[in-house]
Regions:
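Short, charged low-complexity linear segments at domain edges
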Residues: 3-24
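Short Cys/His-rich "knuckle" micro-motifs
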Residues: 48-53, 82
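Short linker/helix segments within small regulatory modules
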Residues: 53-68
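Short, flexible, mixed-charge glycine/proline-rich loop motifs
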Residues: 22-36
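Short cysteine-rich clusters marking metal-coordination/redox-active sites
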Residues: 38-42
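Short metal-binding segments enriched for Cys and/or His
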Residues: 5-8, 64-89
Length: 89
C-alpha cells in the first residue's frame, strides 16, 4: 500500500478530478470490504479488509444514490484533503 503522502495525493486527484464529492456524505457505512475497487487508490477492498462505503444522494432528472468504497486509510486521506480544499475556498 502507498505511503501517506501518496495516498493523500491520490485523494486530492480524486477530488479535483470529480471522482468523489467534496461534501459530507449523506450516509457512511463501515464494515468488511465488498471486494469493490477503492475510489481513491483503485485497489480492491477485499472482504478481509475494513471499508467505508460513502453514499451521496443525487437529485435532478435521474435521482439516485451514488456509492463509493474506500479503504480506511483512503477515507482518512479523503477527509483530510476535502477539508483542506474547503478551507481554501
Amino acid at each position: 500500500m502507498p505511503n501517506e503522502v501518496e495516498v493523500r495525493a491520490q485523494a486530492r486527484h480524486a477530488l479535483t478530478g470529480d471522482k468523489i464529492p467534496r461534501r459530507d456524505p449523506d450516509r457512511t457505512w463501515g464494515g468488511p470490504g465488498a471486494d469493490m475497487p477503492c475510489t481513491i487508490c483503485a485497489k480492491r477492498v477485499t472482504v478481509s479488509q475494513m471499508e467505508y462505503e460513502l453514499q451521496f444522494r443525487q437529485d435532478g432528472a435521474t435521482p439516485g444514490l451514488d456509492r463509493y468504497h474506500l479503504h480506511l486509510r483512503c477515507f482518512a486521506a479523503w477527509e483530510m484533503e476535502r477539508t483542506k480544499l474547503e478551507d481554501r475556498r
